Amino acid sequence: QSRSSAASDVYKRQILDDVVTKAGTSREAAGLEDDTVRTFVKHAAFLQLVRGRRLRLQRTEPNIGALATALADPVNPVTAQYHLAFVASDTFYEHTHRYPGQRHDWQADVDPLLSHAQTYCARIGLDLSDSDRVRLQHACYELTRGAHSDTPSTAAYLGGVAAQEVIKILTVQYIPLDNTCVYDGIVQAVSSFRL
């Protein structure tokens, strides 16, 4: 055994002793074996505690910084405007009891949807640049044109994303998405926001 390996083993044993001491139990009672400790120490740098937010807080107290950063991202395709359009779509539904675009004259719903989106942005204190306003208007147009429907390929893709998240949680091996994921099927862009 090399000198560094022996030092590493001493370090691992010390960590184990510290853990069981803090837990108020003995190593034998805890049933911790050297291999378990070795694996834990090896992967400890990748541990992450994920504390999600309640979905209700997305609307009432969203993370404005995350939205502003997502809208201003110079590298990745911007998808945050679709989140704002979806929030406005829910408000539209609350007022009209239908989703935008579900009537024959669907284009008449674009401006009211955009108005709901702009009202929401003003209420939460999100300042939109001119380019943000243009992207939001386009997102409201596309959402209205789609009339609250989806294509089979989009549904299949989102089903795959959901299945992947379930696998992450069940296997406890990967960090799951935290809070909001937006998929733009037109430009094939996916963004995740912690709102």
Role assignments for model-derived ranges:
Residues 101-109, 116-190:
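C-terminal, well-structured subdomains that either form a transmembrane helix-short loop-helix hairpin
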Residues 9-137:
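Long, low-complexity, polar/charged, intrinsically disordered or flexibly structured peripheral segments
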